[in-house]
Amino acid sequence: MSKSNINDAGRRPAPALSAARIDNDVQAIAAATALADKLRPQALLRDRERILPWDEIEAYSETGLGAITVPKAYGGPELSFVTLVRVFEILCAADPSAGQIPQNHFGVLALLHDLGSEEQKRRFYADILRGERIGNAGPERGRNAISHVTTRITATADGLRLTGRRFYSTGALFAHWIPTRAIDDEGRAVQVWARFDAPGVSVIDDWSSFGQRTTASGTVEFDNVPVEPVQVLPVWQAADRPGLWGPISQLIQAAIDSGIARAAIDDAIAFVRDRARPWMDSGLERAADDPTILHEIGRLETDYQAAQALLHHAASVLDELSAVPVTAETSAKASVAVAEAKILTTEIALDASETLFDLAGSSSTRAAHGLDRHWRNARVHTLHDPVRWKYHLLGNYYLNGAHPARHQWN
């Protein structure tokens, strides 16, 4: 475990000076595909040895992918949410841990779009266009609901000061900016953007989950950290201001699960085709000719295609709704569309990563193959927000017309 602004190897986020410019959807998909080709070869080793993807994340920044949702009014390409989803699917099929690290980056940018002032947008969008990364200092540890916040930002004679301890801080170790939820002197929820190298900021690499092992989603401590007013976003206004930041954040989470499912199915197909033996009673020479296996591969592919179709539909809904002023009804519509997709991507990620072993057989469990990482990654990531509450959200909307609560998990 390491503590302070560096990890065990002494790495710090590099100055963001060399980000490429992406101007259209085709360039974004090409950049994601090329990056995925770099992520894939060592993904198993990084998972097994818990090697943090520093070089890979710096390579991600250099592609310019981190700026693809920056609005055109602020110098960005403002690409579609369908493209954003495809980028995450491509990256997470190659390495879902490295692919998840930018998730909070885009979720926070969506919040900046909805709640940020003009000064804040000009400041932070410019940083992103230069290639800087946004992390996250997530919910606090303990038995309280994740909405419970003890982190405080207070006004002092020397300016604003941030104090607290947060966990589930995916991306923070690699980030230039570390936003966190805090309560201000008036008891209101705000989001505070702390600079990674600000005095009093400590990132602790204590993430020890059995899946998504290299996201470095551990602890961040803020000890009387100095911040400027421009670094404080009024999250409390979200309750009365319809927006899309919650659905956008959830959309990316669903895309991560879609990528995990794709990787599991691809590995199942490859193992059955190249390594698996036929069952003795089948009378076949190849496992790939077993009708029960053919049935299951067909079922997995069908379920995956259905989940992906609903995911891309949800992204299209967000593209449509983001082009016009957001109302309470359209904000709810966005949350519903994404919840429907999130259910199916969760279920196919878990199903595919489990069924893989039924189809591939005992030899597929050898540690050398590392196929268990698909299930471990799917199981850990899908716990981010329980599907049972997505079903509840949908039932309450369709039966009672109830709008989903506005937060990053809806």
Task: Pin down the residues of each PLM region.
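Generic structural signal for well-ordered, non-transmembrane alpha-helical segments
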Residues: 30-33, 259-262, 298-305, 339, ...
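Amphipathic, small/basic residue-rich leader segments at the start of a protein or domain
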Residues: 1-102
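C-terminal helix-coil-helix/basic helical segment that borders enzyme active sites and/or dimer interfaces
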Residues: 44-47, 305-343, 357-362
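Glycine-rich phosphate/cofactor-binding loops in nucleotide/flavin-utilizing enzymes
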Residues: 358-410
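Glycine-rich beta->alpha junctions and the first turn(s) of the following alpha-helix
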Residues: 209-304
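A short core secondary-structure module
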Residues: 168-203
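Glycine-rich flavin
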Residues: 55-62, 68-170
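Glycine-rich phosphate/pyrophosphate-binding beta-alpha loops
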Residues: 167-172, 249-253, 384
